[in-house]
Amino acid sequence: MTCAYIAFTARGLALAQQLAAACPGSVARGGADGVRLTDWTAAQFAQSDALIFVGAAGIAVRAIAPHCRSKAADPAVVVLDEGGRFAIPLLSGHLGGANELAQRLAAVCHAVPVITTATDGRGVFAVDEWAKRQNCAVAEPERIRYVSGALLAGQSVCYAADWAVSGTPPAGVEPAAAADRADFALTLIPTGEALHLIPRIAVLGVGCKRGTTAERLETAFAAFCAEHHFAPQGIVRAASIDLKKNEPGLAAFCRAHGWKMDFYTAAALRTAKGRFTSSGFVQSITGVDNVCERAAVLAADGVLFIPKWARDGVTLAVALAPFAPDWRWKNDEP
C-alpha cells in the first residue's frame, strides 16, 4: 500500500513522520514548501493507495470531496488529530483498507481507532472486506448494501461460488440452493442480480497481426468478454510472444487497462502444459502452433479457462492462476 501523509503544524508533522516510519509513505506539510492542499490531494488521490491527514477531520473532508467517485475506486483516507489521540477512517473503509490502516496507525501512536462502519461495530460479516481479502474485484459496488443490510437486520444471505471455499461460513451466510438464488457470488462469469465478486486471477493471452491498433484490440476484447459473459475485472496481466514486444497498439491497449505484459519466446511457449488449439499457419509465422493460449497458461502458471477466440486479426484466450478462497475476513482470524 502506497501511503501519502500531510500535516499542517509542527506537532502534526512530527506525528506524520513517526507514522511514516512504521507505514512507509511520503510526508508533506500543507502550506509550507509550496505545498497547496488542493494540489496535493488531487495528485495523491490519483496515485496513492491511502491518504493520511494529520489535522482536523473537516480539512480532510473538504479536501477530498471533489475527488470521491465510488467505493470501488477511491483510495483509503484516514485522519488523525495532531495529538495522536484518534485515528478515523473517512473513506474506503473496507475495499480501500482504511479501517485496517486506521488500526495499524493507531497502534503506532497509541491512538483510539474510531471505526464507524456498522458491520465492524456489530461484528457482522462484511462482504466487501472479505472480497478484498480474497483478492476479488466487486463488480457492482452498489449491491454491497443489500447484503450488508440483510445481515445487519438479522437475516441470512446465500452465496454461490465457482471454487470450493475452505473453512466455515460466517454467521448468517449460507450456500444457495441454486446459483440464481444467491445474494452474492464468487465467479468470473457474472449473471443475474447477485453481488458478483470477481477473483483477480486471470491472464489474457493475446495474438495479433503486425500493426494492430489499440482501438482494434479494445473492440475485439469487448466482443470477447460479451460472448463469453466474462468479467474483465478478473484480468491482472496479459501475455504474448516476444515478437509482439514492440507493438505500439498492444502496449497502449494493456497500458489503458493497467496490465503488465509477459513476453515469451517460441521455445518457451512450446513448454506450456495442456491441450491447445493448433494452427499450422501460426507455426509457420511464429515458430509455435499457438500463441494466445500458451502465453496465457505460462503467465498464469495455471490452466486454460477460455480457449482461443479470433476476430479481425486478433486472437485472445484466458488462463487462470491457482485460487484457494477461504472464509477469513478479519485481522484476528488464523
Predicted regions and their residues:
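Extreme N-terminal starter segment of soluble prokaryotic enzymes
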Residues: 1-5
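Conserved mixed alpha/beta catalytic, RNA-binding, or beta-rich assembly cores of soluble enzyme
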Residues: 8, 12-18, 25, 34-36, ...
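Conserved beta-strand termini and adjacent loop/short-helix elements that scaffold enzyme active sites
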Residues: 29-32, 116-118, 264-266, 307
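Donor nucleotide-activated moiety binding/catalytic core segment of transferases
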Residues: 41
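C-terminal non-catalytic interaction/assembly regions of soluble proteins
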Residues: 241-294, 300-304, 311-314
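Structural signal for terminal/edge beta-strands and the immediately following C-terminal loop/tail
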Residues: 297-334
